[in-house]
Amino acid sequence: MSAVNGNDGDSIIAEERLRPLSRDELERYHRNALVPQVGVVGQQRIRASRVLLVGAGGLGAPAALYLAAAGVGTIGLIDDDDVDVTNLQRQVIHITAAVGRPKVDSAAEAIRALNPDVEVVTHRTRLTADNALGLLRGWDVVIDGTDNFPTRYLVNDAAVLLGLPLVHGAVLGFNGQVGVFDARRGPCYRCLHPTPPPAGSVPSCAEAGVLGVLPGIIGTMQAAEALKLIIGGAEPLLGRLALLDVWGGRLREIPVAKHPACPVCGENPTITALVTEADSCTIPQTPGADAQPHARTAEDDSHRQSEGSRPDSSASPRIQGTGEAPTAESAADTVSAAELRQLLAGAEPPALLDVREEIEVTLEPMEGALHIPLREVVARMDELDVACTTVVVCAAGIRSARAIEALRAAGYTGRLVNLDGGVKAWAAG
């Protein structure tokens, strides 16, 4: 196959959009064009393409850099977050000096520095049911680098309604996954997971962590899948989900079939307009979070209502679900940070159990708390005093709720109360 003629396979880029490459472009992308499956025509397709990245974080960062380096003509970025110091461990498009800046601005600056010929379109906004169709319309392919389930489902549904291919990616710990969803010729994300998981049912990267190189691997794989769709003639991960265990050094794939009962792309779809899944999956963004595999994770429910916005807030704090001022004995299953402060100042303060990891406790200690990591809490439950109420805490109230469930299932008979919003809410006052 000629490196000049390129690949004659099915590309998502219409031939009428192609134009000759300049001498400077031929020199810059020479190594791409030397690959027979790419060729000059393939490079023309890359240069003519428009790729939208939803999320400029752990997955979007490497994807954006490699797409820019490859010569993608226009790259779009959607993200409403600012760069946080915790992002720098893996979000390689951002530098230390960018901390506090909008991610889309930091990423756009890095893209332009790498390849000034790339047009960058930025949207510093959160994707919603009201703006998603307008923001996704007109792009050739969408890369999902979202960090929460409501947005992930929204991106999928918008892509289906607009007839766009969607490149999915997710990471957590040592595990990642990548696949291509295109309802016109295969399944969509809802064919695999029809509805979001319950809020708090799975941990976030902020809670469970992620090995910094993993988003780089998965994000780069997403960029490769997008380029394959653009160039044509390749075998995209359509109807297949690649699963990577970087710790075990294993890469495998599972088939994903188009589901006839899929609510958005099935034979009788029930989703014909966009809705945000926030009611069934209240999972706002967490600084430093990344997209997570559905089966293992959910985004950290870390921005719950503050004490000042709670319907039952008053000068005399109440236990949630009661009309009484809090006491250790009357405490319900959940207690706010303000209520916990009142309990601790009382005559019979509750015990505190911190189920976070050691590094979290070191960075932000909870004074007076017994520290037992979540994974050890059942095995060490004899260290707890069943005679008194124990308030269980974690970063945001997710792991602590799971710790309470595990302890009760294991037969613990003492009273257990969850700190709503966790240490984040406690630190916020």
Q: Where are the regions that the model predicts?
A:
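Adenine nucleotide-associated cytosolic modules
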Residues: 1-326, 330-331, 357-359, 371-374, ...
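A structural motif
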Residues: 72, 366, 412-413
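A short, well-structured juxtamembrane/interface segment
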Residues: 330-346
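C-terminal accessory/binding modules appended to enzymatic or scaffolding proteins
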Residues: 341-348, 357-366, 372-374
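Structural scaffold elements adjacent to functional motifs in cytosolic proteins
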Residues: 352-354
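C-terminal structural segments of small proteins and small subunits
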Residues: 401-420
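Histidine-bearing beta->alpha loop at or near hydrolase active sites
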Residues: 421-425
